């Protein structure tokens, strides 16, 4: 009877950054590389030991105006494997990039412990992970085989 507790990848990335000293009003912006200049991202703010969701998970094409309104108001810390490609485009003084942030198992465990135990084992049999976009598997084509 070990429960399966779902934990959001972007929140795990945030938890990996929280050990550093951040300003109280800073927003955390984890980014997963989607393709070209697209990332999967959300905005979070630390409130005590909890993460407060400022904007929901979304797919975003990064351009010079991305996050412009938010950056005009407060500092935003960008990290994750999608942040590096955004560094040359998002140049606002309130934009801070944190290198080498990867999901850590210890952070996943901490987030799982903080999550309310609202999902019981029966419900977990029907649990489906959240994917922002539908996965479409293309048939593989091996050269020389038909």
Language model segments and positions:
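Surface "functional belts" at beta-alpha junctions
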Residues: 2-103, 131, 136-137, 141
């Amino acid at each position: 009877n070990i429960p399966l507790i779902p934990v959001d990848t972007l929140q795990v990335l945030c938890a990996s950054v929280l050990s550093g000293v951040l300003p109280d009003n800073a927003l955390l912006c984890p980014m997963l590389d989607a393709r070209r200049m697209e990332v999967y991202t959300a905005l979070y703010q630390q409130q005590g030991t909890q993460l407060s969701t400022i904007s929901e998970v979304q797919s975003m094409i990064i351009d010079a105006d991305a996050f412009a309104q938010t950056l005009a108001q407060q500092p935003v810390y960008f990290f994750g494997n999608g942040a590096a490609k955004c560094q040359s485009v998002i140049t606002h003084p309130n934009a801070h990039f944190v290198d080498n942030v990867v999901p850590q198992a210890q952070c996943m465990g901490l987030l799982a412990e903080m999550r309310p135990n609202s999902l019981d084992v029966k419900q977990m049999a029907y649990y489906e992970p959240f994917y922002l976009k539908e996965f479409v598997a293309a048939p593989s084509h091996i050269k020389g085989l038909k």
